[in-house]
Amino acid sequence: MSVHKTAILSAVISALFTSGAGQAAEALTAVGDGEGQLDIVAWPGYIERGESDKAYDWVTGFEQETGCKVNVKTAATSDEMVSLMTKGGYDLVTASGDASLRLIAGKRVQPIDPTLIPNWKTLDPRLKDGPWYTVENITYGTPYQWGPNVLMYNTNVFKTPPVSWSVVFEPQDLPDGKPNKGRVQAYDGPIYIADAALYLKTAKPELNIVDPYQLTETQYKAVLDLLRAQQPLVHRYWHDATVQMSDVKNEGVAASSSWGYMVNGLVADKQPVASTIPQEGATGWADTTMLHAEAKHPNCAYKWMNWSLQPKVQGDVAAWFGSLPVVPEACKGNELLGAEGCETNGFDLFDKIAFWKTPQAEGGKYVPYSRWTQDYIAIMGGR
């Protein structure tokens, strides 16, 4: 799915969002001296200062250059990010598409001025004006990284890459002759409903699913039925990267949705693991650095947004996280990422990814995210 061509929102929702655009009046007109501090909510592994590996540090140089000391609060899910931003006390958040529109609608983030970010001109054209951070032609953040939700698998179990997501959704024996029950994982977040919908788009074409984030009642019921049938198969609903890596190493997990971050970490640890994007395609995420509506350190925030778009920073983040840079130039000449890093992580798969976005009712045509949340919690609980 090519998300930049997707219709953004219904007229009703657009009107709601536009009402929140008044915050732009208080936005910076020029970037001045930093306030000395910057507080960021981020995914684990997104803001590294060399503590995990000395080679991966894109914070120390920023602090030395700007005088802005960076404090990071990690969040394991988009729902946690929305909760933290609602409580306040942070300047920036690295929001995925299933959080960004909620933050905009809830007036928790403010518009930014791309003309105050010199490196904006280096952005990948495919990401400019993405509907997950642009509403009514107003820009609500700076792209940071993107990537697919891959199918991770144990190479001792699968001698060739699995061709379908059915290995995690449908009861079956895996290639080693043993059942998949208790050996697969699913993501611990309502947005995973879209993964099931994407699978059924191919597996049950009679449902006529076009967009896995826009499900009619009939389509939605079929997706929930699939997820309820999957529940007894699931070893764990994962959201913590470290826990999933441990499960793969120690608990016999043979297949799961995952991120490049975990796959790369397990491969580096000499584990028999690889990843693939099956025939049905994959969901994915395009993360945006968004500015809190009441940010206390806006100058440091703008300095960070510009810093984050440097090719070296983008390439280093992509190498560490197993993601893809939003600046194409970052794919070249990065020692950590390597010459084939962008290709390996899926740089050319953009149009095959159904990027996360917040499901909207659009006048009652589709099932909204609030229902996704209620129903997925029930499914994970076995109801």
Protein language model regions, located:
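Conserved C-terminal helix/tail region of periplasmic/extracytoplasmic solute-binding proteins
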Residues: 352-383
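A ligand-binding cleft/hinge motif common to bilobed small-molecule-binding domains
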Residues: 99-102, 256-272
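Periplasmic-binding protein-like
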Residues: 122, 221-230, 269-293
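A bilobed periplasmic-binding-protein/Venus flytrap-type ligand-binding module shared by bacterial periplasmic
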Residues: 152-157, 198-201, 285-297, 316
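Paired acidic/hydrophobic, glycine-rich loop segments that form the ligand-binding mouth/hinge
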Residues: 91-95, 237, 254-259, 274-275
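Early extracytoplasmic/lumenal segment of secretory-pathway proteins
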Residues: 25-103
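Extracytoplasmic ligand-binding site segments that recognize negatively charged/polar headgroups
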Residues: 48-54, 94, 99-243
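Mature extracytoplasmic/periplasmic domains
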Residues: 292-356
